[in-house]
Every structure is written in structure tokens, then in C-alpha cells.
Amino acid sequence: MHEEEIYTSLQWDSPAPDTYQKCLSSNKCSGACCLVMVISCVFCMGLLTASIFLGVKLLQVSTIAMQQQEKLIQQERALLNFTEWKRSCALQMKYCQAFMQNSLSSAHNSSPCPNNWIQNRESCYYVSEIWSIWHTSQENCLKEGSTLLQIESKEEMDFITGSLRKIKGSYDYWVGLSQDGHSGRWLWQDGSSPSPGLLPAERSQSANQVCGYVKSNSLLSSNCSTWKYFICEKYALRSSV
């Protein structure tokens, strides 16, 4: 009887099976949570490292792209300068050919200037009776062994404008002055620059290339593709006496 009471007492003091299972279950959950947290941290660190790596690579690619773009811009500028230089050389070549043709034809001609040309000192001028764009006007003058008018001084400008008033009045006449839209320089056909007092008074802002023309007493500028009269010029034949 006494032993049964002791056994009952011991059995009552021992923990219940449910409580022990709960503790085991609680310990298992805590370990799983820690494992998940560790894996999450490792994954986040991996993402952060990958993001930094990709960011560095993107920066490198952007830098290379900017360098390539700068090189491309420089190459385009070099090509543009070469094209302008080639065009200038072609114009000077045509100018030299026209000068030689004029010299040869003058050797067989007794008068200082051809018919329908106006003489002023050492130059002969032809005032066209047709309209054309600037480049076509240039070609028409070359066919006559001359070039578009190149005004060297204010005295020559006064003679031209005075003669035009007597011939046709106030019209527009192309001269051999042009300005490229990229370089912005005014140049005569022989590659020389006009004197500051003979620069055009106004410029068309909408055109890629503008050319000079004479109207009344002024030297102005306009789109080279517009239609105007033109003035040719060549050297007068010197007397062989």
C-alpha cells in the first residue's frame, strides 16, 4: 500500500508527455527559422553583390559607349572638313582652268572684252539675262572662261552697282561669295576671304548654305537654291603694243 502511494506520487511529479513534445517541437521550429534566416541573408548578399557587379559593368559599358560616340563625332568632323577642303580645291581648280581659258582666248582677240561685256580697268563684267541658282550661275560663268563676280574693293562695288542701275535697275545678282553652314566662313571662289567692309549685311538663318548677291548698293545673302540673275567677271585683254 505504501509502495503504491510512492509510485503514484512519482508518476504525478513526472512531466506530461504533451509538454515534452511541445518543447521538442519548439526547438525544431527555432532551428528551422534560423536556417531560413541564414539562407535569406546569403541570398540577399548574393543579390547585393550581383547588383554591384552589374552596376559596375553598366558604368563601364556607358563609358565605352560615350568614348565611341566621341570618336564618331570626331570622325564626322574630319569627314566634313575633308569634304569642305575637297570642294574648295575643286572650285580653285575650276577657277584656274577658267583663267587659263580666258588667257588663251584673249590672245586671239583684239578687244579688251568680248561683246556684251562691260570693262572697268583690268576686268570685264557680264550681266546675265537669265535666272539660275548660285551653283548653276557658277557653271555658266565657267563656260565663258570667267567666274562669278569677285568684289575686291569699295570702288569696284560702286562701279558694279552704278552699272546695274543703268542696265536693269534694282534686281538681285549672284556674286562669287558663299558661306558654308558648318564652318560659317565667307569665301570667294578662289578661297580668299572678303574684306570686313564687303561682308553681307544679312544672313538667311534657315538655309544650310547661303550665298552672296548684289542688290542696289548692298551686298546681301540668301539661300543658294533661290533663282537670281548673276554677274560674271574675267580679266580684260591687255594691249600688246
From Swiss-Prot:
SMART domains (UniProt xref): CLECT (SM00034)
Tissue specificity statement from the Swiss-Prot or TrEMBL entry: In peripheral blood highly restricted on the surface of BDCA31(+) dendritic cells and on a small subset of CD14(+) and CD16(-) monocytes.
Family annotation (PROSITE patterns): C_TYPE_LECTIN_1 (PS00615), C_TYPE_LECTIN_2 (PS50041)
Function: Functions as an endocytic receptor on a small subset of myeloid cells specialized for the uptake and processing of material from dead cells. Recognizes filamentous form of actin in association with particular actin-binding domains of cytoskeletal proteins, including spectrin, exposed when cell membranes are damaged, and mediate the cross-presentation of dead-cell associated antigens in a Syk-dependent manner.
Post-translational modifications: N-glycosylated.
GO cellular component terms listed in the entry, alphabetical order: cell surface; membrane
Residues listed as glycosylation sites in the UniProt record: 81, 223
This protein's name: C-type lectin domain family 9 member A
UniProt-recorded Gene Ontology molecular function terms: carbohydrate binding
Subcellular location, principal: membrane
Disulfide bonds: 113-124, 141-232, 211-224
Signal peptide: none
Quaternary structure note: Homodimer.
Membrane topology annotation: Single-pass type II membrane protein
InterPro entries: C-type_lectin-like, C-type_lectin-like/link_sf, C-type_lectin_CS, CLEC9A, CTDL_fold, NKR-like_CTLD
Localisation per UniProt entry: Membrane
TM helices/strands, residue ranges: 36-56
One Pfam family hit: Lectin_C
